Amino acid sequence: MNILDKIDAASLRDDVPAFRAGDTLDVHVKVIEGTTTRTQLFKGVVIRRQGGGIRETFTVRKVSFGIGVERTFPVHSPNIEKIEVVRRGDVRRAKLYYLRELRGKAARIKEKR
């Protein structure tokens, strides 16, 4: 194990739940506004999870006031307070880019039993 691997291993988080594409998450993000810090909730469906180790990221999509919003987070970011899995989705793909074109009820994902 070289020096960079040791540094990466030291900054990995251990409180990340197991989730994959299709799951609905609550991501609690720290937002700094001037001198105050608050927590902002971003709730949506995971459309992709990519990378590995310290560089691993995931993208969450939600529809806010009729407009699709996607946000990409590093899994091991210190700006994420916690990640909660709300629902497990039953999908057959690792990347759910096709959800971008679907509207309304067609964009729903079945819940895993």
Swiss-Prot record:
Q: Which GO terms describe its biological process?
A: translation
Among its keywords, does the record have Repeat?
Answer: no
Q: Which UniProt keywords are present, listed alphabetically? A: Ribonucleoprotein, Ribosomal protein
GO MF term set: structural constituent of ribosome
Which branch of life, at top level? Bacteria
Question: SUPFAM superfamilies of this UniProt entry?
Answer: Translation proteins SH3-like domain
Show the GO cellular component annotation of the record.
Answer: cytosolic large ribosomal subunit
Show the InterPro entries listed in the entry: Ribosomal_bL19, Ribosomal_bL19_CS, Ribosomal_bL19_sf, Translation_prot_SH3-like_sf
Coiled-coil annotated residue ranges, if any: none
Q: Summarize the protein's role.
A: This protein is located at the 30S-50S ribosomal subunit interface and may play a role in the structure and function of the aminoacyl-tRNA binding site.
PANTHER family xrefs: LARGE RIBOSOMAL SUBUNIT PROTEIN BL19M, RIBOSOMAL PROTEIN L19
What family does the entry list?
A: Belongs to the bacterial ribosomal protein bL19 family.
Q: What name does the UniProt record give this protein?
A: Large ribosomal subunit protein bL19
Species, as recorded: Corynebacterium glutamicum (strain R)
> Lineage in the entry?
Bacteria, Bacillati, Actinomycetota, Actinomycetes, Mycobacteriales
